[in-house]
A protein has these predicted regions:
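N-terminal capping/interface segment
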Residues: 84-108, 116-124
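Hydrophobic alpha-helical transmembrane segments of polytopic
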Residues: 47-51, 118-119, 192
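Membrane-interface helix-boundary motifs at transmembrane edges
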Residues: 32-45, 98-109, 173-182
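Alpha-helical membrane-spanning segments of integral membrane proteins, especially the hydrophobic core
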Residues: 111-115, 148
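Residue-level recognition of transmembrane alpha-helices
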Residues: 115-116, 244
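N-terminal, membrane-interfacial amphipathic/helix-forming hydrophobic leader that caps
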Residues: 1-97, 249-254
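Intrinsically disordered, low-complexity regions enriched in Ser/Pro/Gly/Gln/His and often acidic
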Residues: 34-36, 122, 220
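Transmembrane helix-loop-helix hairpins at the membrane interface
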Residues: 5-9, 13-28, 124-254
């Protein structure tokens, strides 16, 4: 989603990272209970650790720990290192079958036509919503426009609807076989969607006070639900990445 350039204090950042990780942990445990505990913990246990490390990398970049060799008002360095971290894990865990994380140009998921139809509607709705809700063309330096047109969509799609979804599906399905009612995959999609919303809504009062700003960015939850539906329907991250990018940059044009 679109990112602002407001700097967050390092203490607040660490607290937010902890809160987001705990939120994810609780979501995973709740889903495991709904599945009667018939899950593969070997895939689920590492997820909160990976999520926490990825968030720390992101915040290190925001505070200049990773350098400031690109410039601009946004966290290029944190996003680049975070993306590299996610890609490394994808290669290590799913390198033999990248389709499991949606890294394929092929649009041959469980319902590709439905996915493409939802993509078309979502694209139009995104443009119309931005034109009505954020009237006037926004202007920023080219380096910032390039950031919004690349890093958030790549980093977040590779993590949320790529690696995280794939690990959850592995954990929520037994022996690598999808349940006949697809319940495990549905729960994985729900966890990813709520976590995506949480990542854009969780904050702190600065003294370990948990705050979930339910109506601060509800569109993140809506986008998250639509994009993961498209990801599952097409079997690919391509269209979610494109839609995510459009959502971030459409304000520069309409």
């Amino acid at each position: 989603m679109y990112e602002n350039s407001v700097e967050i204090m390092s203490g607040d950042s660490f607290q937010i990272a902890v809160f987001e990780t705990l939120f994810l942990l609780v979501s995973i445990l709740a889903a495991a209970l709904l599945l009667g505990g018939r899950v593969r913990w070997i895939w689920l246990v590492p997820i909160p650790v990976v999520a926490f490390l990825g968030k720390l990398i992101l915040f290190f970049g925001a505070h200049g720990t990773l350098g400031n060799w690109i410039g601009g008002n946004y966290n290029w360095e944190g996003k680049i290192y975070s993306t590299a971290f996610t890609l490394t894990l994808i290669i290590l865990l799913f390198g033999r079958d990248l389709k499991q994380v949606g890294l394929t140009l092929s649009q041959k998921g469980i319902a590709p036509r439905l996915g493409i139809a939802i993509t078309s509607v979502t694209l139009i709705a995104t443009i119309v919503w931005n034109a009505l809700y954020f009237p006037g063309v926004k202007s920023e330096p080219i380096i910032d426009m390039l950031y919004q047109g690349s890093m958030p969509s790549l980093d977040e799609e590779l993590w949320f609807r790529g690696l995280l979804l794939a690990m959850l599906v592995k954990g929520f399905t037994t022996n690598g076989v999808i349940r006949k009612d697809h319940y495990g995959i549905f729960l994985a999609a729900v966890v990813v969607t709520f976590q995506f919303w949480a990542a854009h809504s969780i904050t702190t009062n600065g003294d370990w006070g948990f705050i979930f700003r339910t109506w601060y960015n509800p569109v993140a939850g809506i986008y998250g639900a639509l994009w993961i539906t498209i990801r599952l329907a097409t079997g690919s991250l391509i269209l979610p990445i494109i839609l995510h990018t459009v959502a971030n940059i459409v304000g520069y044009f309409v």
